Amino acid sequence: MRDALDSVINSTLKEWECVIVNDGSQDETLSIAKEYEQKDNRFLVVDIPNGGLANARNVGIRNSHGKYILPLDSDDKIGEKYLEYAVNYLETHSETKLVYCLCHFFGDINGFRKLPDYSYQTILWQNVFFPACVYRRSDYDKTTGYNPNMKHGHEDWDFWLSLLSPNDKVYRIPDVQFYYRKHGVSMIDGTIKRLSETNRQLVLNHLDVYTPFLGDMIEWHNELLHYKGSYLALLKSPTYKLGHVLLSPLKWIRNIFSK
């Protein structure tokens, strides 16, 4: 948490406020937050019962007074110039709805995080943003906020679908200004069933967005079944079985020399 708060303090843009939401945490989070609040009046601590990440984001934003919003999770960091770059761009490009940047992993995994290029069609099927994008408070107020029914993750992806429309412009700063701490297991990691339920809830929250693609989805499903059937038929074919037999001696030799 200190890394996150220190990264805000070190920002080259000095006119900011940081609302720290303690979402029912019973560890040292609240004491650390109050420590920063006492030494810098740009910090504000809001202590609430545990209500989930989406609710915490909404509480933080609704207790803020700034023109722009940047949600920052407690274990991530921003670069020194991220706020400056993002705010300056939004100030001079009124047609742009959201600004983000290049991203670097740190923690259990270190390295550049390659994100797919943004298009509205792409974000319907996969999340192309990290949580800490910058957008206008006035645009947030036109939505219902982050949806608390996204209980097992994807709350940010769900919000981007509420925030963005097909013709909205998005800008990516061509510089690494966000550092995403990678843990061994994230909130969205878990069973296939839970992930499936989360994806289903995402679609249900945005039926108006996904309904026009229903015909395409049925066609894709049928194509997938066709390819699956072709693959299973290949596995049972004499040609495949013969190839497997012919390769067996080579695999045996490889295993000997690999010991």
Region spans (language model):
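Boundary detector for helix-to-coil junctions that initiate low-complexity/charged tails
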Residues: E197-K259
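Glycine-rich, basic loop-to-helix element that forms the pyrophosphate-binding segment
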Residues: A4, I48-S64
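Acidic helix N-cap motif at the loop->helix transition within catalytic regions
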Residues: M1-R2, D27-E35, K77, K81
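Short aromatic/hydrophobic "clamp" motif used to bind/position activated sugar donors
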Residues: I69
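Conserved donor NDP-sugar-binding/catalytic core segment of glycosyltransferases
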Residues: K81-F112
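A conserved acidic beta->alpha catalytic loop
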Residues: N22-S31, N50, D73
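Conserved nucleotide-sugar donor-binding catalytic segment
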Residues: Y118-T198
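Short, acidic, metal-binding catalytic loop of nucleotide-sugar glycosyltransferases
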Residues: D6-E15
